[in-house]
Amino acid sequence: MEPRAAVQLIVFGERNKTDVDGVLGDVRTAGFPAFEAGNMFETYGESQTRRLLNENGLKVSGAHFGYREYADPDKLEAHIAYCKAMGIRNMMCSGVADTKSVEGYKTSCKLFNEIGSRLKDEGLIFNYHNHAWEFEDLGGVTGMEIISTETDSTLVKFNIDVFWVAFAGKNPVEFIQNHADRAGYFHFKDGKRGDDGKAVFLELGRGMVDLPACIQAARAAGAEWIVAEQDRTELPHLESVTISRDYMKTRLGV
């Protein structure tokens, strides 16, 4: 099965709240068949959400929430109901209880296993989304190593963000290969390290990530979704997402 393409709506910033019709129009015009966002029912209501998707001919690849939303039982139930109503299989989680302590990761892993089991029973998939901080040393072990050993690979999958792996000084191709049993939903992000040491986000193909090598590894791992994610851009939104979409088509074959 060939992976499908989508875009994360984070690149549109505040327009997601003020101009959602324009945002999804840009997604459609750029050539993306799908997108990833949060719980659209909470922001726009169910009827408007369905109207927006139908009018633009778009699908939703996945739903993304922070750790605290998963730790809140009421929020979790609302998000599960949303995903089931919309036919969304993949739920993403960013963050842990405490990124600076081993105990924070272990506490989070216990919750991830519980939620992963619950979602699996509902026909959904729990995916942990990495940043760079999971690769920081916590006294002989990293957060990513804790997550890898303390969670059940059949319940907790990885939403691998290839840029953050590279930004942390690791090889994203090797990371994908080492976690192929958890890989399926990918964030393809590009960028570079700025003069201040912070991440500078760029359109796909304009940064430091070897994306052609990453797509080969992702395909070998059975990728279902390749989602273009750019936290922010200096370009007009439509120009930005069109550049990334064209790169995905011409260089990645997605």
Predicted segments with their positions:
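N-terminal pre-domain/capping segments
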Residues: M1-R89, D181, K249-V254
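Hydrophobic faces of well-ordered beta-strands that scaffold small-molecule active sites
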Residues: P3-L9, F35-A37, V60-F65, M91-C93, ...
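Conserved, mostly hydrophobic/aromatic
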Residues: V7, V27, F35, L53, ...
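Charged helix-capping and loop-helix junction motifs
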Residues: D21-G22, D74-H79, Y105-N113, G140-E145, ...
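Acidic/histidine-rich catalytic cores of soluble enzymes
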Residues: L24, F35, D121-M208, I215
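Active-site acidic/histidine proton-transfer and metal-coordination neighborhood
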Residues: F41-E42, R68-F158, V165, L238
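A short, acidic, flexible beta-alpha connecting loop/helix-capping segment that sits on the rim
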Residues: V227-H237
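C-terminal helical cap(s) of enzyme catalytic domains, especially alpha/beta-barrels
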Residues: P236-V254
